[in-house]
């Protein structure tokens, strides 16, 4: 509950909403090798990590629908393809729905309420912009709340079409691409994320869609514990073997690493560095470990993995070495349980968050016998700020509440 209230408080702090992103100034990278900004300990020791456990929320979480067991054919995901948000075009399944099919469709009141927040807020902003009046924080907050709740609405593909939500001039693209209103950067990011989800006909509101949930050990009935796993039948699975942002948005959030793998943000269910030999690293995750990373937001000092061969680094470490030579940026995800030196203002409240692209500016070998490398990562300019505070904070209060409900339901799985 404390984390949900804290996130809600952070999301409502700003009464003055900036209409364009505060882009961090370019950081001059350093040549190899590079040293950390503080003395390193002779032996690695885990840093003290703030507790990530949360009590059962008191606030109502009834808005989070139950996990879908089956989907009707008309609401099945078409494929894992995703749109070009710079030139959005409604998907075929959306365009193929005829008006006559929508006439008798009844949209549930709870769904209508939150979708109307998005559209009413957009209409108010557009009316003001046409009168050369700058929309205020309350106008944007209405849209913000509507979008955040929309991720968890139990709706259908027909409802998305009936409400014109993928239309370029009336739907979500009007926020991130086409409209006369200069919306805040974080609204554009979240509208684009929701658009990508719905464009693929992914209407499942569950955080754990496409995941087979493991079950706790129950000695009374003789059942061993099982772990979560990817559902091989899930059509929306994306893969993370690419450089750059791809379909991912700044601040996109997942409750677990497996969910990030499902959506193609990362490629390994356990490892922190993902890549390909001879090509480089695609993504790296700041999580727990024996070596405390150093996190300054725009700059990170990130440890590679220990090698059993004193003459050669691990494959994961070698991937990042290759990035330092090719200058291919790496996707960086931060986990709530990451191990860092000192206090960390960039840690998500729960789960893991995508924080954009970083260049591997340099590295040095900290332990030759174990081939432990320390990499200097520098966040690329012209990206939105890291979403750790303010109205743009991720995870959102809705995401935290949905995660709490999922944990409660999982605890009582038969």
Where are the regions that the model predicts?
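Compact mixed alphabeta submodule
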Residues: 343-413
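Ser/Thr-rich, low-complexity intrinsically disordered regulatory regions
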Residues: 1-99, 399-414
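Acidic, glycine-rich low-complexity segments with interspersed aromatic residues
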Residues: 66-353
């Amino acid at each position: 509950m404390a984390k949900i209230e804290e996130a809600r408080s952070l999301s409502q702090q700003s009464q003055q909403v900036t209409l364009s992103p505060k882009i961090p100034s370019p950081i001059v990278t350093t040549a190899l090798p590079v040293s950390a900004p503080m003395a390193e300990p002779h032996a690695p020791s885990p840093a003290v990590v703030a507790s990530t456990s949360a009590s059962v929320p008191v606030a109502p979480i009834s808005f989070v629908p139950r996990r879908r067991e089956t989907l009707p054919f008309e609401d099945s995901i078409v494929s894992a393809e995703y749109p070009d948000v710079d030139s959005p075009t409604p998907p075929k399944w959306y365009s193929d729905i005829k008006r006559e099919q929508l006439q008798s469709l009844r949209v549930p009141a709870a769904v209508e309420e939150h979708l109307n927040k998005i559209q009413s807020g957009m209409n108010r902003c557009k009316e003001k912009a046409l009168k050369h009046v700058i929309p205020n924080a309350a106008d944007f907050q209405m849209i913000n709340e509507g979008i955040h709740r929309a991720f968890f609405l139990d709706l259908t593909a027909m409802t998305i079409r009936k409400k014109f939500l993928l239309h370029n001039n009336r739907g979500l693209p009007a926020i991130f691409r086409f409209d006369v209103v200069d919306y805040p950067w974080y609204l554009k990011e979240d509208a684009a994320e929701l658009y990508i989800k719905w464009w693929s006909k992914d209407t499942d509101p569950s955080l754990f869609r496409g995941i087979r949930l493991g079950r706790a050990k129950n000695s009374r009935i003789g059942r061993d514990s099982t772990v979560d796993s990817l559902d091989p039948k899930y059509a929306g699975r994306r893969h993370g073997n690419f450089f750059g942002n791809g379909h991912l948005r700044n601040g996109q959030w997942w409750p677990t690493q497996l969910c990030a793998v499902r959506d193609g943000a990362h490629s390994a269910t356990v490892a922190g560095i993902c890549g390909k030999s001879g090509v480089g690293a695609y993504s790296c995750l700041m999580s727990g470990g024996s070596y405390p990373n150093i996190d300054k937001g725009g700059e990170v000092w990130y440890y590679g993995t220990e090698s059993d061969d004193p003459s050669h680094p691990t494959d994961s470490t070698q991937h990042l070495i290759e990035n330092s030579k090719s200058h291919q940026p790496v996707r960086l995800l931060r986990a709530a349980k990451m191990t860092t030196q000192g206090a960390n203002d960039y840690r998500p409240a729960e789960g893991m968050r995508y924080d954009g692209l970083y260049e591997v500016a340099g590295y040095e070998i900290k332990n030759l016998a174990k081939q432990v490398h320390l990499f200097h990562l520098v966040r690329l300019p012209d990206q939105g700020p890291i979403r750790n505070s303010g109205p743009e904070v991720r995870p959102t209060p809705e995401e935290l509440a949905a995660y709490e409900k999922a944990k409660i339901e999982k605890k009582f799985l038969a």
